[in-house]
Design a protein with these regions (language model features):
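Conserved short alpha-helical segments that host acidic/polar catalytic motifs at enzyme active sites
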Residues: 1-244, 248, 260-267, 271-290, ...
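Conserved phosphate/anionic-ligand binding catalytic regions in large, soluble enzymes, centered on
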Residues: 24-33, 98-102, 170-179, 247-251, ...
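Glycine-rich oxoanion-binding loops at beta->alpha junctions
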Residues: 66-83, 271-284, 307-343, 490-506
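Acidic/histidine-rich
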Residues: 154-185, 454, 459-485, 520, ...
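Active-site phosphate/pyrophosphate-binding segments
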Residues: 258-262, 266-293, 383-512, 586-606
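Glycine-rich phosphate-binding loops that contact phosphosugars or nucleotide phosphates
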Residues: 287-436, 516-559, 581, 589
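Generic C-terminus detector
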Residues: 539, 565-606
């Protein structure tokens, strides 16, 4: 879960690399480093912590090299410190790496036997010494080919050589890597987002490929060293400006943007004239699909779980939901009439991509729901449904989660209608209600003051629980995850009906418990479960929707009301106060809300 950048140019590159690393910090921010090459001398600087600290380093300010590589790190092997920060170097070779080398211990033993001395605790350093060892007898290209064949695991690499003053080598297996093209300079980066400020012309390396980048041309090779021709893709535009504006944090801005991003997504999929949902170029006949498997990680998994309830409520399709890291290692019974849907904000989630690759190897029907349409998951899927929510910078997903749920719900309505699971009138009624969603979310955002007031009870607690039934259960899971991610408070989401089967033992006097009890078919049962935790001393924060009827329950600590809507849309509205709760809890504790500890936005390692 690191980010790499490389630039071969005819002018100094250090400031451009630093700016690109700032855009890659969503991939990791434990440490950062840069190396540039000029007149046969490699200048290198590293820092623990953010790129801002690296930028202030006097070595960086004096770098004049026109060839350079940079790195932001999320630690996998070795503690996050300057010694373990990238680049890692020998006398002649400097490497930046995203991924995990699974056989690093074996390779290190071999290299130590050859007299190599290791300085760090990282797996990356074996790559440096392998290349150095093979360069004793082989030319550069041969040494790269031999090195890559020795590595087990995943990697995206940027490599410079003291005695090769005009080039960068890039290579990938399992981790994404892109090449960008500019005037008198070319670029290497973990993804298009890192390169968009410099170019909108990009090529992507496939698994096992490597490239040699110079300022005026780029060559691509397969794992045997044979030349590969690459298409140059022109992205829709250069970098989209995105800053915090008047908000203190990106997350706060992204929460407030949700009415606009939902409206934008609805406009992309719903025809304004006939109110029909348009999913263009859907590649399969609906009669060829009898079941669906939804696959994701973290927040994306929660959106998949939410969609399962919608599919089962509105269609006759059989639906399974799986965590990508579990799906990819099980003995799966692949079915030709099953549609596999992969959900990922970044489109680069390693386990989700591996699950997709497994399905592609078995010639399955694959569809992806992503925010980044140039991503690996999008490129390798048969069909892509973008969520159209714009850049999301905060590590804890907010508007992307809403966008994932929205696109999944739109797909539910379209497939349900095509299968004639409901009539046209019902279909049009549901779309009519859907178009009201942005305004409903906008109105629900006004609950801010009460959420701010209750958040202190969560920051002081040893732990908390989030309970829901039916449609509300996936949202309870998401609410608990957000509190864990941002406020570092232990929180668990449970089906409300499961409390008597063990979790009730954890309830103690004063423990905050969030109960999601919208006035749906499960309302009365959920209120009964709420009473059970109140009876054992819990402080219950009830979140329900507005109604003329009062909640008949005593000793509720606080109640937050969201707007009313049909049952399908209530999960969107219940999500908003949970996002705010996590935000204000973290704010009270003074934590870094946009970049919580130990986490990264794009999870590109297993």
């Amino acid at each position: 879960m690191c980010g790499i950048i490389g630039i071969a140019s005819n002018k100094p590159v250090s400031s451009t690399i630093i700016n690109s690393l700032k855009k890659l910090e969503y991939r990791g921010y434990d440490s950062a480093g840069i190396a540039t090459l000029s007149n046969g001398i490699v200048s290198e600087a590293k820092s623990e912590g953010r790129v801002d600290i690296l930028e202030k380093n006097s070595i960086v300010k004096n770098m004049i090299g026109s060839i350079g590589i940079g790195h932001v790190r999320w630690a996998t092997h070795g503690v996050p410190n300057t010694l373990n920060a990238h680049p890692h170097s020998s006398e002649n070779v400097s490497v930046v790496h995203n991924g995990i080398i699974e056989n690093s211990t074996i390779l290190k033993k071999f290299l130590v036997g050859k007299g190599h001395i290791f300085k760090s605790q990282t797996d990356t350093e074996v790559i440096v010494h392998l290349i150095t060892e093979y360069l004793k007898e082989l030319n550069l290209k041969e040494a790269i080919i031999k090195t890559l064949k020795q590595l087990h695991g995943s990697f995206a690499l940027g490599i410079i050589f003291k005695d090769q003053p005009d080039l960068i080598v890039g290579a990938r297996r399992g981790s994404p890597l892109a090449v960008g093209y500019g005037p008198s300079e070319n670029y290497l980066g973990s993804d298009s987002y890192a390169l968009k400020s410099m170019t909108n012309k990009i090529s992507y390396l496939n698994d096992g490929e490597f490239c040699i980048i110079k300022k005026d041309h780029v060559e691509f090779f397969d794992e045997e060293g044979l030349k590969v021709n690459k298409k140059v893709l022109e992205l829709s535009s250069k970098e989209q400006d995105y800053d915090k504006g008047d908000f203190k944090h990106f997350m706060a801005k992204e929460i407030e943007e949700q009415p606009a991003t939902l409206k934008n997504c609805i406009n992309e999929y719903v025809d304004k004239i006939n109110n029909d949902i348009n999913i263009y170029n859907f590649p399969w006949n609906i009669s060829d699909i009898s079941s669906i498997t939804l696959i994701g990680c973290g927040t994306a998994y929660h959106s998949c779980l939410m969609a399962k309830y919608w599919f089962e409520e509105n269609t006759s399709l059989e639906v399974a939901v799986d965590i990508a890291s579990e799906f990819r290692y099980r003995k799966n019974r692949f079915k030709k009439d099953n549609l596999y849907i992969f959900v990922s904000q970044s489109g680069e989630t390693a386990d989700t991509y591996a699950a997709l690759d497994l399905c592609n190897q078995n010639d399955m029907k694959t569809c992806s729901i992503v925010n980044v349409v140039e991503s690996s998951i999008a490129r390798d899927s048969n069909f892509v449904l973008p969520i159209h929510c714009g850049p999301e910078i905060g590590v804890a997903s907010t508007k992307a989660f809403m966008g994932q749920m929205l696109v999944l719900y739109i797909l539910v309505l379209k497939l349900g209608r095509l299968r004639e699971d409901f009539d046209k009138e019902t279909y049009l009624d549901k779309i009519k209600e859907l178009k009201k969603l942005p305004k409903l979310v906008e109105d629900t955002l006004l609950t801010e003051n009460k959420i701010q007031a209750v958040s202190g009870s969560f920051t002081d607690a040893k732990g908390s629980m989030f309970l829901g039934r039916g449609f509300s259960y996936p949202i309870a899971l998401e609410g608990a995850l957000k509190l864990k991610e941002l406020a570092y408070v232990h929180a668990e989401g449970y089906p409300a009906g499961e409390m008597k089967h063990g979790p009730l033992a954890l309830i103690e006097d004063g423990m905050p418990v969030v109960v999601l009890a919208p006035r749906d078919n499960y309302y009365k049962k959920t209120i009964s479960n709420m009473q059970e935790v109140i009876a054992r001393g819990a402080k219950v924060l009830l979140i329900t929707n507005k109604s003329k009827d009062e909640v008949f329950s005593e000793n509720i600590w606080e109640t937050i009301l969201v707007e009313s809507a049909n049952d399908d849309l209530l999960p969107f509205l219940l999500t908003v106060p949970l996002q705010k709760l996590a935000y204000y809890s973290a704010l009270l504790k003074g934590y870094d809300i946009d970049k919580p500890r130990n986490l990264a936005k794009s999870v590109t390692v297993e």
